[in-house]
């Protein structure tokens, strides 16, 4: 089983880096897991320019996704899932014969529409908005508990 997390931006805060390392170290003992970071574009401030930023980041994300992968995008407008539902979704993806499950975390502006269309499922951890850097840590924690 291979797990890939495609995330826009880099982690700057040490406390988040430490948490990510904690869960990655645990998961890597059992699973082939990697994080692929996509360059984050600066927010230009205008709606038209923001859409261009989403497109640029989205094209980079799509380039990294294999055709044979099961893709789960984390999007604020996605289906809100519980820990149990998340675990069931991940296990189901591997049970369907997919060799890789790809999770996508967008940047501060979200995820481009075409990436959400490519995803097999769009989920949300909460109706609240979290910094995308913190979402990476939350995702790893949920993956860890889903695959125990």
Curated annotation (Swiss-Prot):
Keyword Nucleotide-binding tagged: no
Reactions listed under catalytic activity: pseudouridine(1915) in 23S rRNA + S-adenosyl-L-methionine = N(3)-methylpseudouridine(1915) in 23S rRNA + S-adenosyl-L-homocysteine + H(+)
HAMAP family the record matches: 23SrRNA_methyltr_H
Subunit structure as annotated in this protein's UniProt entry: Homodimer.
Designated name of the protein: Ribosomal RNA large subunit methyltransferase H 2
Matching Gene3D superfamilies: 3.40.1280.10
Entry keyword Transferase: yes
GN (gene name): rlmH2
Swiss-Prot/TrEMBL keywords: Cytoplasm, Methyltransferase, rRNA processing, S-adenosyl-L-methionine, Transferase
Molecular function GO terms recorded: rRNA (pseudouridine-N3-)-methyltransferase activity
Residue positions binding S-adenosyl-L-methionine: 74, 106, 125-130
EC id: 2.1.1.177
Signal sequence interval, chain numbering: none
